[in-house]
């Protein structure tokens, strides 16, 4: 069973790209709160956050690509309605 993602057992779950976009927004919010802090520690945290944002953006793009691929090949997901997975096993 998945904890966060939509699945047969978790029809109220969310799509991976939606979770990642929300997480990216949270990181951006944190960045704005430390953007004026010029202490070395804050600058390093900001630099780290920028790298994290790059990785999150890449992960979002990959997840969206997978969703589009599955939509084209098998039609829209029915997992939110308790339907079977489009690929793999339940």
Residue ranges and their predicted role:
Residues 3-4, 17, 32, 50, ...:
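Residue-level marker of intrinsically disordered, low-complexity segments enriched
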Residues 1-34:
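N-terminal acidic leader/helix
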Residues 32-79:
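Short, charge-rich amphipathic interface segments used for partner binding and complex assembly
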Residues 1-4, 76-90:
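Short intrinsically disordered terminal tails
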